[in-house]
């Protein structure tokens, strides 16, 4: 396509255009990883696709509590190179290695460096827009919204907070100015692994952040129900929780595949509430915190 249908005779400009498209697709893919809390686990260059597709995810997992330093890969436990928070940087690093590999086909560094900037530009733009949609903000407002996003991501790890359930709960936060603080924060309480820790400084910081957030939502003037629908369309209710996957594997090992099939069917519509399947959206139970297969995996798991 880049070469107008030609099957041969590609020149340096064609290879640069090809590389630019790969950088763009890689950035777009990783934005979606960050949106749903997916951790690939082993982002070696040979585990990346030039099509911007998620492949070769062996020791992968989803964030349970929001922890940018988490990786499910036991072999990466010490250095955490491929941790959730590092995935955007690793994506750029991997694209850089591809640029080094195709340099002999291009013969100049500058065009490849310029094409590599596509990754940074696309990721930054799409990530910021993505976070806006997760918060239900239709039109982002420069530095002010960047600070709102930054402060939330700094706040979430202060106590164990289920990422998936927090953003679903945030959709139910009301902009009604007649609510007291307890009623306002109530939709978020189910996301905390130990609600008793939601006190003191963390509670005060959360209340202060909600003040700013609700004020921002009121500026846009959207009806709460419309905003909630938009947020729930980008914030999944169901993800492949590590402990649920292990339970399904355990049952399949006994010859009963029914849980795997039900889980698979549930995940086909991850943004939709599904009566009778609420257990697939529950926080990680305490027993799964350190159980192999639920908290950590190896490449041979």
Model-assigned labels for residue ranges:
Residues 26-33, 59-61, 125-134, 155-165, ...:
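Short, charged low-complexity intrinsically disordered segments located at boundaries
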Residues 191-301:
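C-terminal amphipathic alpha-helical interaction region
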Residues 45-46, 50:
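Catalytic-loop Lys-Pro-X-Asn motif of eukaryotic-like protein kinases
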Residues 1-40, 51-158:
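ATP-dependent phospho-/nucleotidyl transfer catalytic cores
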Residues 102-111, 174-179, 250-259:
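Short helix-capping/linker segments at secondary-structure and domain boundaries
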Residues 28, 93-96, 100, 165, ...:
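Generic structural signal for well-ordered, non-membrane alpha-helices
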Residues 109-235, 242:
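Helix-loop elements that line ligand-binding/catalytic pockets
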């Amino acid at each position: 396509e880049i070469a107008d249908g030609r099957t041969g005779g590609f020149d340096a400009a064609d290879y640069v255009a090809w590389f630019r498209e790969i950088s763009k697709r890689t950035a777009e893919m990783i934005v979606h990883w960050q949106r749903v809390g997916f951790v690939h686990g082993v982002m070696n260059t040979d585990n990346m696709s030039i099509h911007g597709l998620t492949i070769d995810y062996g020791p992968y997992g989803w964030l349970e509590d929001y922890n940018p330093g988490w990786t499910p890969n036991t072999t990466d436990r010490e250095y955490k190179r491929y941790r959730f928070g590092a995935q955007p940087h690793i994506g750029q690093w991997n694209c850089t290695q591809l640029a080094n590999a195709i340099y002999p086909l291009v013969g100049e560094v500058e065009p490849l460096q310029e094409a590599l900037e596509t990754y940074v530009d696309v990721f930054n733009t799409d990530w910021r827009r993505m976070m806006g949609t997760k918060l239900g903000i239709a039109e982002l407002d420069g530095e002010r919204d960047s600070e709102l996003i930054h402060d939330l991501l700094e706040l979430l790890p202060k106590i164990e907070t289920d990422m998936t359930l927090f953003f679903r709960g945030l959709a139910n936060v009301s902009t009604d100015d007649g609510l007291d603080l307890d009623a306002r924060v109530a939709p978020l309480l189910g996301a905390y692994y130990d609600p008793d820790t939601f006190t003191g400084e963390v509670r005060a910081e959360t209340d202060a952040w909600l003040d700013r957030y609700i004020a921002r939502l009121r500026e846009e003037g959207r009806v709460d129900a419309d905003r909630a629908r938009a947020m729930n369309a980008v914030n999944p209710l169901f993800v492949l929780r590590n402990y649920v996957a292990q339970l399904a594997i355990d049952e399949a090992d006994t010859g009963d595949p029914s849980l795997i099939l039900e889980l698979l069917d549930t995940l086909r519509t991850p943004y939709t509430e599904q009566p009778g399947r609420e257990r697939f959206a529950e926080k990680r139970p305490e027993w799964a915190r350190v159980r192999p297969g639920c908290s950590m995996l190896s490449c041979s798991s």
